[in-house]
Regions:
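Hydrophobic face of amphipathic alpha-helices that form TPR/SEL1-like repeat modules
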Residues: 35-36, 54-57, 89-98, 123-132, ...
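TPR/TPR-like (Sel1-like) alpha-helical repeat modules
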Residues: 182-189, 222-245
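Terminal, low-structured helical/coil segments at or just beyond the last alpha-helical repeat
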Residues: 241-277
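Helix-turn-helix repeat elements of alpha-solenoid scaffolds
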Residues: 6-9, 59-72, 103-107, 139-141, ...
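Short helix-capping/linker turns of helical repeat alpha-solenoids
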Residues: 22-26, 40-44, 48, 59, ...
Length: 277
């Protein structure tokens, strides 16, 4: 990329000064622009890619408006292609991977994560792409090695529960339900330690509930499963507040599982009450 095409502080100012976005729904975005747009000099006061990163963290309960997205995309691409900022490639991947940025494109996300896969957060998301076949062909072998690397180097809760899925289902590895169970509990410990996202916690609790449903149906296992599903529902609903609308199907599935567990519990209680002949 030729240097003259990079976004300069004055060009960045003009783009953001004219940006159309929902001010009332995006108070954090408005505050960031107030802090870093110098109306007297008509330029921004920090590097564009740093401003882009701050805007990515703002107003998570609102789908990103196109003008803000386009600025972030341009600023991060400049950062990556001009100085090979590896973190810019990771953020670009996130920009196209997560729903709240309003421009999901798994192929672009996979390509950006692949450029700098040695960066921890990129590695787990690259593994997730290979696991689900997002933006690339599904490949459990590649997924496994990305997830193992992320689990060992970053202690990622996300990588741990996906590794649990691989052992639970026998994807690339031998099926091992106890190992899957241990990985899910380890993922939960890590998620609590680092205060992971609501979505990550929900995914873990959903899996713990399901793995306990595979056990003999006792009051203890069923009560644990129900508690896990209740927490999964709570965290999925929290995640939906951050514009992860595709999770509504997850919430429906969890509520069906809650109903199933309650029916098992009712049957057990009725059996206990039946007189012995």
């Amino acid at each position: 990329m030729e240097k003259e095409w990079l976004m300069t502080p004055d060009v960045a100012y003009e783009r953001l000064d004219r940006a159309i976005y929902n001010h009332s729904a995006c108070p954090e975005t408005a505050h960031i622009l107030y802090l870093y747009l110098d109306d007297e000099k008509r330029e921004i006061t920090i590097p564009p890619k740093e401003l882009a990163k701050e805007l990515m963290e703002a107003d998570k309960n609102h789908l990103m408006d196109n003008d803000i997205f386009n600025f972030i995309d341009k600023a991060l691409r400049d950062g990556y292609y001009s100085i090979k900022d590896s973190w810019a490639s990771y953020y670009l991947g996130c920009l196209y991977y997560f729903e709240r940025f309003n421009n999901v494109n798994y192929e672009k996300a996979f390509n950006y994560f692949s450029k700098e896969k040695h960066i921890g957060p990129s590695t787990v998301l690259l593994g997730e792409c290979c696991f689900y076949g997002r933006g690339t062909e599904q490949n459990y072998e590649k997924a496994f090695f990305c997830l193992i690397q992320s689990a060992l180097t970053d202690n990622s809760a996300r990588s741990l529960y996906l590794l649990g899925d691989m052992y639970l289902n026998g994807y690339y590895v031998d099926k091992d339900i106890p190992e899957a169970n241990d990985l899910y509990f380890h993922a939960l410990e890590v998620a609590d330690e680092v205060d992971s996202s609501s979505e990550t916690k929900a995914e873990i609790y959903e899996r713990l509930g399901k793995v306990y449903l595979l056990r003999p149906k006792t009051l203890e296992t069923l009560h644990f499963a129900l508690k896990a599903f209740n927490l999964a529902e709570k965290y999925y609903l929290e995640a939906m507040q951050e514009c992860m609308f595709s999770l509504k199907d997850k919430v429906k599935e969890i509520r069906d599982l809650q109903m199933e567990v309650r029916e098992y519990l009712d049957d057990l209680i009725l059996m206990d009450k039946e007189p012995v002949s």
